[in-house]
Amino acid sequence: MHWPDTIVPIEESLKAFDELVKEGKVRYIGTSNDTAYGLTKANETSKNKDIVRFESIQNNFSLLNPRFLDELSTVCKNEKISLLPYSPIGGGVLSGKYNNSFYPDDARFSAYMKHENPRVQAQATRFVNDKTKAATIKYLELAKEYGISPVTLAVAYSKHFDFVASTIIGARKVEQLDESLAAFKFKIDDELMKKIEEIQKDILYPMG
């Protein structure tokens, strides 16, 4: 379920999913962009009604947006629900391409800022703002210290936690894909994690 449905009761949605699973059309179901409350309510509904439950949740999670760790991670660990993080490099921001020019000509958020819909523009400024740029500078320095690409660092962070099943990555060029795949051989140790946490404390919630 791509977004929480604010109109249809969660029980009704889960019963519909349950039928699909019983018919063999779907193996497992997952949700996306939900809150700790929403995921907990859905999970309790599945238990009480003895119907299929969400096995995964797909949410925005990255060095620039670690909010999942506040509450949702606890739900996932206790209920054994896996996170599939998307935007692990913050929509490309963590690559550093927005540091020299706020909106490069060939970048996604440059197009967003020119969009006539204010909501689309707001999405761009959520990803690219003074705080995300400041945090990115620190992560670029940290990646350089460890001799890796900032993209590799970002993807490695997104898959570091035990409640993460897999990380959703995207690339337009082969070299971009290589930087992401390198993260699967790079392990974040305790010392590096402490440095990351220091940056996160210094610049709280860059994406709001």
Where do the PLM segments sit?
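Beta/alpha (TIM)-barrel catalytic core signal, keyed to glycine-rich beta->alpha loops juxtaposed to Asp/Glu
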Residues: 4-5, 9-198, 207
